[in-house]
UniProtKB/Swiss-Prot annotation:
This is B3 domain-containing protein REM1. InterPro entries: B3_DNA-bd, DNA-bd_pseudobarrel_sf, REM_fam. Residues 7-92, 162-259, 285-385 bind DNA. It comes from the Eukaryota. Residues 115-158, 393-415 are annotated as: Disordered. Disulfide bonds: none annotated. It comes from Arabidopsis thaliana (Mouse-ear cress).
Length: 517
């Protein structure tokens, strides 16, 4: 296990919902995926996952157990290996820590290498009043500003800090990322080109070239930036935050984890969830009916939705087979091309009647097929014959409803005028006089009319019947159109045959004429 980092104490201001980011060096982050947190409140040791320096899973439970409040200043003291002691400090102790020597301040997170501060000093409860808390918060802001200025002025080899960079279209096209001015302040006045390691959140390293633009004085990295973006899902417009380390053989830029609410993180999570969802697989089964018209034309049409959902989009030879493995050759033909979207449909041109005959399927019988793919070629497997009684009940019920609506008595020359009765507007119909007659027996006649009309003749049933009639008419038109196309093809073939026969007759007559001469 790697040696613990050289720092031992630093502090953070607690905010509900936030997860503290601990500025740990690269070696520690590469060799540790968790930390162990202790406090004076109990002897329990809390295991908290470490996500690139940020405390993640387990931190909220620890904070809830410790009853931290917004604005509390938390001090993390490193006890070696993975153990950190966490305590809430009072404003006075916080000021002492913050007023430490500038040479001991290392990064944005205020921490110093202090071993002479006892746990009891910063483990005491905060008993000061609100005025002291406000004064302590002002001191924190003032010291933070001073710390930032010291960081910019400090260019020593052990200096570490944060820089931000945005992924642009130019950087992706030219495999180059221009670093911010802050990097120049942190890195110093190095003029020569050198190598730099860029490390992602998972600890993977990319060695790139670090160079400086002489005219602008801005540093940039190249030769590997595009691969880094591709491996980490970085796209144009993403904002990246790096931490700079200079205590190794070459400088290191460590990609910091994205904070909650970042667009790139949310986008990646959404993409992963979307990819994880299983796609709905279309059904390969099809139920068709052996109708007299199909017997006549020899064409078994397939539903458009079935062919579209199963990606059947080209014509060609297909194989029909049954449960015994017997095969029939068929051809999948398309018709209706050039007539607009939804006008094309496929049909089987031959072989299917022989298959039905071999499997006991006759005219007006239904049967079930299964689509099986053999590479890129579809095959249709005969599954079973479906007895007519399976659909007879539902079909007869619909027919009975339709007939009841058609045969229901309809009033002649009816004019209606509303009359407010006990239960609302009601009507009485006088068929002989052709107009509405007011009566005191409105409720009785209304009840008689309701008994005369069958319950199936509601508006919704009539709409359904009309819709079904339109669908049936459309199917009939399509079938007739298919039959006309087939007849046209047959007539054209007959014309070609007649032309060929005429040529043969003309040739024979020519031979006979030459012989007679």
């Amino acid at each position: 296990m790697a040696d613990p980092p050289h720092f031992s104490l630093f502090q953070q201001k607690f905010r509900t919902g936030d997860k503290p980011f601990l500025t740990l060096d690269a070696d520690f982050l590469m060799n540790h995926t968790k930390v162990l947190l202790k406090s004076d409140a109990s002897d329990k040791v809390w295991k908290v996952k470490l996500d690139g320096g940020r405390l993640s899973e387990g931190w909220e439970e620890f904070a809830c157990d410790q009853k931290f409040r917004d604005g509390d200043v938390l001090v993390f003291k490193h006890h070696g290996d993975e153990v950190f002691h966490v305590a809430v400090v009072s404003p006075s102790v916080s000021g002492d820590i913050r007023n430490a020597s500038s040479s001991q301040v290392i990064t944005e997170d205020t921490y110093i290498d202090v071993d002479d501060v006892d746990d009891d000093d910063y483990g005491q409860d905060d008993e000061d009043d609100d005025d002291d808390d406000d004064e302590g918060e002002d001191n924190i802001e003032n010291i933070s500003e001073k710390t930032d200025k010291r960081q910019e002025a400090d260019s020593s080899s052990d200096h570490s800090g944060f820089i931000t960079a945005r992924v642009t279209r130019y950087s992706l096209l030219h495999d180059r990322l221009d670093l911010s001015r802050n990097f120049t302040l942190l890195f110093g006045g190095h003029q020569k080109t050198c190598e730099i390691d860029v490390v992602d959140e998972q600890g993977r390293r990319w060695t790139m070239k670090l160079a400086k633009n002489i005219s602008s004085g801005v540093f940039y990295i190249r030769l590997g930036w595009g691969n880094f973006c591709c491996a980490n899902g970085l796209t144009q417009g993403d904002l990246c935050k790096f931490k700079l380390f200079q205590n190794e053989e070459r400088p290191v830029l460590w990609l910091c984890p994205q904070e909650s609410g970042n667009g790139r993180k949310e986008k990646r999570t959404f993409d992963e969830v979307s990819k994880g969802k299983e796609k709905k697989t279309p059904s390969p089964f099809l139920i068709v009916k052996y109708t007299p018209s199909r017997e006549t034309t020899g064409q078994l049409s397939l539903p458009v939705s079935f062919t579209r959902n199963n990606s059947i989009n080209k014509t060609g030879e297909v194989i029909l087979l049954n449960q015994d493995g017997r095969k029939w050759s068929s051809y999948l033909q398309i018709t209706g091309l050039g007539r607009g979207a939804g006008s094309e449909w496929f049909y089987l041109r031959r072989g299917w009647r022989e298959m039905c005959e071999a499997n006991g399927v006759g005219v007006n019988d239904s049967f079930k097929l299964e689509l099986v793919w053999e590479g890129a070629n579809p095959m249709f497997k005969f599954c079973s014959k479906i007895e007519n009684h399976e659909y007879k009940g539902k079909g007869n019920q619909r027919t009975r409803k339709k007939r009841a609506c058609e045969t229901a008595p309809q009033p002649r020359n009816v004019k209606k005028t509303p009359r407010l009765g006990v239960e609302g507007p009601v009507y009485q119909v006088d068929e002989e006089r052709g107009h509405t007659q007011v009566s005191n027996r409105t409720n009785t006649i209304s009840g008689n009319l309701q008994r005369l009309l069958p319950p199936s003749c509601s508006v919704s049933d009539q709409v359904a019947n009309v819709k079904q009639g339109i669908v049936d008419s459309l199917n009939t038109v399509r079938q007739c159109r298919t039959e006309l196309e087939t007849s046209e093809q047959n007539l054209q073939a007959s014309l070609l045959a007649i032309d060929a026969l005429g040529e043969r007759i003309w040739g024979i007559s020519k031979i006979l004429s030459s012989n007679l001469v």
